Amino acid sequence: MKNWKKLLSLCLALIMMLGLLSACGQEPTETSEPPADVTDAAPADTGEEAPAVEDVYAMEGSVTIAYPEGETAEIQPVLEAFRAQYPNIEVVEEPFAGSESGAFNEYLAQTVAANSMPDLMWLDWNDFAPEVASGFVYDITDLFFSDPESEYVPSGMTDPYTYGGKLYALPCQMNAMGITMNLDMLDELNIEKPGYDWTMDEFIEIVKKGITANTVGAATLEDLDNVYSAQAEGWWYPAYDFVNQKFDFTNMWVPAMNRLAELRAVPGLEAWIMRYPKLEDDTTSLDSEYVAKFGEAGKDDNHYTFKNGLALLCTNATYNDNWMRNECQVNWDYWPYPRVDENTPTYTPIHVDCAYLTSTCADPEAAFQLLKWLTYGVEGNLQRLDIFAARSDGEFAGETTTLLKTWFMPCTQHPDVVAKFSENPNVTEGLAALYESLEYSIRGDINKVIPGYNNIFNDEVNALLNSVRQGQANAADVAPQIDALVNAALAEQLEAFNAKVGE
């Protein structure tokens, strides 16, 4: 594929130079690079038909793809579209039980032992670093970055899958974190609908307006501290400098946590904090402030007040969209997280499942075409968006109670894809704004990509974090201890990981 592109460019360059020679009587100047617009130029009629870009669809090959069997209804129409576009690439499907934690790692280990690894893995939501360290994954650096369409993929979506300067995976299913707003309550309380580029000051003003005798401003502000510990270029949440591979809770998390603590100190602002202190079994006491205001209904459901019209907003994520559509008794929509101030963008946290080629992939060129189709490719995304847009809200996946997805968030910011996403009748104005905010995306699920995450954020560290969130300790007092614990553990995990990758 690359060879004929080079041949086309050289032929066109020669034709143009000959034209200059005949017109001006000058010797053509030798050059090693074709003009910038050569790939868009129409070839001269030489009697021979030049290869067309569409010839990539004539590529031959065979690809075996493995995916969680619970996602069959979602992926099969997308694979059928690929087969129609690439009729000479055989796609063999291998569904497997991939719904449990560690299922992907276990499946790969089993197929390695049987010498039968698939060529492509799709929708891996497990810890990815161990798969790289085990040598299960193919380096796609050259395949990806030599493709012009790769420039439309924000670096925040590929950086997490880059180890030792090599890219090993691509995001294939993405969910964004943001705010969900009760549109009915906005009207009832005569609150002006905020813009999607709102600031933290506007957010605070609005959430306070949601406090009445019967309602709260927020059902939950969970994750607000994590999100605002990473509102800067080069950071993931919580408070992780991924360039220097170091956590900084003291300088990044403390200010964010202090802001959250101030909001939670406002009487009646957040239902979540009204449940604390909880009982030893982690249930809400009947003597709690929550029960005093709302009764026992939903006392242990963090989103109950939002679902039932008793809260103006809540922090949320699109991975909750399925049950939100099923259970919410109000009209609602998404908003991006507010900007820190008017001079900064919103760095929207994303949760991502990935897809990748395996190290035993027999035909990387053909397999990469399918990988591209399922991840960032423009044509694959446009066709997949059409497939999802054609669905009606309320359709279930097979015999399950799971609703079919009526939209998905593409992992590219290509203008054609962005426009197509917004045209979907199932995509609301707020959801479109949330998707557009992904130009500046940060990872909110670093447990999937940082080696040994669970050994870093162990019970001791989580207890320290929760003591602050529940109002039992001060962030500034606890943060240095957290930094010392997590950075020491991180250094140990990185050393072990890098040693294994380098073997």
Predicted regions located by residue number:
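A structural signal for short loop-to-beta-strand junctions that line the ligand-binding cleft
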Residues: 109, 119, 149-185, 214-219, ...
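Hinge/lid segment of periplasmic solute-binding proteins
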Residues: 48-54, 123-176, 333-336
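C-terminal lobe and pocket-closing loops
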Residues: 324-328, 343-349, 357-459, 501-502
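Short, well-ordered beta-strand elements
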Residues: 54-70, 89-95, 119-120, 168
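Extracytoplasmic ligand-binding clamshell segments of periplasmic binding protein
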Residues: 99-103, 220, 235-343, 347-348, ...
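Extracytoplasmic "Venus flytrap"/periplasmic binding protein-like
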Residues: 81-155, 187-190, 303-313, 326
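Short, polar/charged alpha-helical segment
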Residues: 51-57, 69-90, 457, 461
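Helix-loop-helix "hinge/cap" segment bordering the ligand-binding cleft or interdomain interface
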Residues: 84, 145-146, 162-283, 359-365, ...
